[in-house]
Regions:
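Short beta-strand scaffold positions
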Residues: 4, 33-34, 74, 94-97, ...
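Short active-site oxyanion
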Residues: 29-32, 68-71, 107-111
Length: 135
């Protein structure tokens, strides 16, 4: 299973030097998972970077189409409690901790795709196989 955080998922929809790595990792995995927060984060980032309304609508449509294939992990009380623990233990932001807490709920083994370097030590310590530009 491939758990994807928003830093990586966003690269699926924008031109970026990390896009080929993200696309390859997603193509190799038959099962994708992400926190419910990831979809909103990505769609808002695409809205903010869109050069036109048509561009934004096309990007949002692509996210909605792909999201049908994503196993969405809810950001509920259990997830938030675990995120608090992770954030406190590793000194990362709540948003970063939410992505890790969501991935931590998945059955192992989990490959964790992120471009956020702050998450890497925590993800490794949580037992995830890392998929990053540096891994």
């Amino acid at each position: 299973m491939l758990a994807i955080d928003s830093s990586a998922l966003l690269r699926r929809y924008v031109a970026d030097r990390q896009r080929p790595m993200v696309m390859a990792a997603m193509a190799r995995s038959p099962v994708w998972a992400a926190s419910a927060l990831a979809r909103s984060e990505v769609m808002l980032a695409l809205h903010q970077s869109a050069s036109s309304l048509v561009g934004q609508q096309e990007a949002w449509a692509a996210v909605r189409d792909d999201w049908e294939a994503v196993w969405e992990v809810p950001v509920d009380g259990r997830c938030l409690a675990r995120a608090t623990e992770i954030g406190a233990r590793y000194g990362i932001t709540l948003v970063a901790a939410i992505h890790l807490a969501a991935a931590d709920r998945l059955p192992r083994p989990v490959r964790f795709l992120t471009l956020d370097r702050r998450q890497i030590p925590a993800a490794a310590d949580l037992g995830f196989d890392l998929v990053t530009p540096t891994a």
